[in-house]
Amino acid sequence: MSELDHIKNESVDLVRIPMEEVFEELKCTKQGLTANEASHRLDVFGPNKLEEKKESKLLKFLGFMWNPLSWVMEVAALMAIALANGGGRPPDWQDFVGIVCLLLINSTISFIEENNAGNAAAALMAGLAPKTKVLRDNQWSEQEASILVPGDVISIKLGDIIPADARLLDGDPLKIDQSSLTGESIPVTKNPSDEVFSGSICKQGEIEAIVIATGVHTFFGKAAHLVDNTNQIGHFQKVLTSIGNFCICSIALGIIVELLVMYPIQRRRYRDGIDNLLVLLIGGIPIAMPSVLSVTMATGSHRLFQQGAITKRMTAIEEMAGMDVLCCDKTGTLTLNKLTVDKNLVEVFAKGVGKEHVFLLAARASRIENQDAIDAAIVGMLADPKEARAGVREVHFFPFNPVDKRTALTYVDSDGNWHRASKGAPEQILNLCNCKEDVRRKVHGVIDKFAERGLRSLAVARQEVLEKKKDAPGGPWQLVGLLPLFDPPRHDSAETIRRALNLGVNVKMITGDQLAIGKETGRRLGMGTNMYPSSALLGQVKDSSLGALPVDELIEKADGFAGVFPEHKYEIVHRLQQRNHICGMTGDGVNDAPALKKADIGIAVVDATDAARGASDIVLTEPGLSVIISAVLTSRAIFQRMKNYTIYAVSITIRIVFGFMFIALIWQFDFSPFMVLIIAILNDGTIMTISKDRMKPSPQPDSWKLRDIFSTGVVLGGYQALMTVVFFWVMKDSDFFSNYFGVRPLSQRPEQMMAALYLQVSIISQALIFVTRSRSWSYAECPGLLLLGAFVIAQLVATFIAVYANWSFARIEGAGWGWAGVIWLYSFLTYIPLDLLKFGIRYVLSGKAWLNLLENKTAFTTKKDYGKEEREAQWAAAQRTLHGLQPAEKNNIFNEKNSYSELSQIAEQAKRRAEVVRLREINTLKGHVESVVKLKGLDIDTIQQHYTV
């Protein structure tokens, strides 16, 4: 393969030499390479991808010990070995080794878990590897772009990301978006023999090309090392920083108070004071927090993949959990995208033409390979798909693009005459044919008739090309006919939309079809018919009642929009974001990319173009809306795990810092830093399992509310600190436990008090996770077996230490099984109010605690279906009101809507509109018959024999 070394060394300018010389230099033809030749060239040029920087495993491992939380622990280790060297005692080697072990254990667990999650994520992303059509062994096949080599012939079509630097072969000019490479905002025209760059996007046209450079030798590859790889600090990282700073500030406050009291006022010994400071530093820092949250998110992304959603950006999970508006395409998402044509409804407008000829012309204007849904439906109506090209010679095919919205074929018939056939959007075909006003009115009447039945219209036209040239304008176009296309809704779409509304996600239909079709589809799916034409987005709607409504409010309250172009999608997302909505947007085409990138969660649907996938945050591998709603539920469960852990981490910091601070200052009892290390190690081992814990998703959109996290953490942590102080006071200054439980007093046994205090802190600290992980009573929501097992094992270890340990260096001596039983009982009794505190702080923070109390909407109930009765009553009232059985509901002085957030109002309004639409279905003959049958108790089979519905 030495003859190709000059290509690899780039000693030949393949961009400027004539195309004939390109083939000579690359030793190839327009028929492409053979598989063997391509394999040899792959060995010479390497894979068509950029070299990945391999991160050192050692540096990655050490990176887990290089963050603000780890720095605090490292300062504590230095204090144990340096500052603790005083008071006639040697350096605190045990604590130093313990802290280092804690850091190593945490880093090891984090390294293993994140490495596994990273491998899983890499495997998922491999499924999104760009693919391309390549000609090898004289056959076209779809292959991964990484196997391309110079000399390969590839096919480029609308929406493709160019896989390698290439020169265009014969064909029509392309429109190429090079903005990601050159910064040009307007697509540039590329003619045959021009070069196209790897990474640019085909915006219009279709052509074949020969690859001239791959991998690091491409224009993109050479520029890659110049790209600034500085990582932006995302919202998730800011949240972690805020929580970490809160914990560090809490510890700093405790340390300052201890320093001000212990040395100037109490005149404590230097070494004892250092030990107390170490307790706060070691016990208060949630050292495992960054790893737990990152691993939870990575593990969650794998679960999403199993449900048919690949996350390209991990932080999209938290945004998906907070999504309250979903703008979704009708075709393929709400419907099956399996079109059928009703031959009986075909309208013919050309004289002397039958319906079969309309079908034939439409089939000729369709592809017979690489078909889209419309092409497949049209060609499939023929008795034999080969009829589409029978007796004619194809000269040129004009592919579909979002601007022209039509396809066309130039062909020569058996008599040598040249013709063109075109099919496409009726409005585009009408303009093409330059139809008179009366014809337009007739066509629009047929279109409206189709639309009322939920049918899309496809216009067909023909033209004679007297010049007999493929680029000739030809004679006048003639409108031939209209075809009705029906795309049935998915069987699960209606139920999925209802689920979405109940989850607080307002689903808006975005369709390029007519308004009447959008309304009919919305009616069938029960999502409401409050839909508007795309002109309403620009304030051009003629309806005076809508004209007075601000565009932002119109978009917010609409159930959908029809006649939408890609630029309208961008405007919808932009306006919704201005109204503080977290907006999801689905898309599949190259022109959807700006809206997908603008949306908080860009979702590329199944079979989306490379450009749409590149701009999206989540790529679906399964069709339908149900995949998205399942992903929302999974994301909320993942987010709940992360939020619950952060509340737990803040609570533990408050509980350790203030609990031990008060004990140290009031009773001058010096808790052992080594025992705090044991608590921290056991805690981290247990908490690492939270990423796999079973979790109920939030019933409403959720997001990081730091005020709620800090408030809940302070209340729960403060309560636990108080219970520890009370326990120590009763144990040291009274005989309560010995009098009532028969255990020996410990007031004069500080080593055994250390053991008892250690066990009490360990049990109640770890048990707190069961409170923070549940939305209702903690005992009613069963945790995962892994979390439960880890808790049991950790507390068995803690109990055995408290009962049997005799470690002089840690100043601890076993307190016996009697005290262990007392401590477990005390911990159980003090655990019960934690749920009540959780409910209390939640209702106080919601701002409607008094209203909830008056209307009995509290969590202090054993009912499983919370709020079910009220929803059923609202449903019954809506039915009675609709049928005139009772007047419309009057406002209550405690109007629920006035107290709910605006987002909940919008979801509720959409839900009610959907309910009304479904209830209108009752006013049909079938609904009336079934109602009478139920009322009279008649035989339904007998009734159905006499009524045809």
Swiss-Prot record:
Q: Which SMART domains match?
A: Cation_ATPase_N
The UniProt keyword set, sorted, is: Acetylation, ATP-binding, Hydrogen ion transport, Ion transport, Magnesium, Membrane, Metal-binding, Nucleotide-binding, Phosphoprotein, Translocase, Transmembrane, Transmembrane helix, Transport
Residues exposed to the Extracellular side: 82-93, 265-273, 666-670, 731-751, 806-813
Which enzyme type, at the first EC level?
A: translocase
In this UniProt entry, the residues modified to N-acetylserine are S2
Q: Where is the active site?
A: D329
Q: Name one Pfam family in it.
A: E1-E2_ATPase
Q: Does the keyword Magnesium apply?
A: yes
NCBIfam families per record: ATPase-IIIA_H, ATPase_P-type
Its protein name is: ATPase 5, plasma membrane-type
Q: Which gene underlies this protein?
A: AHA5
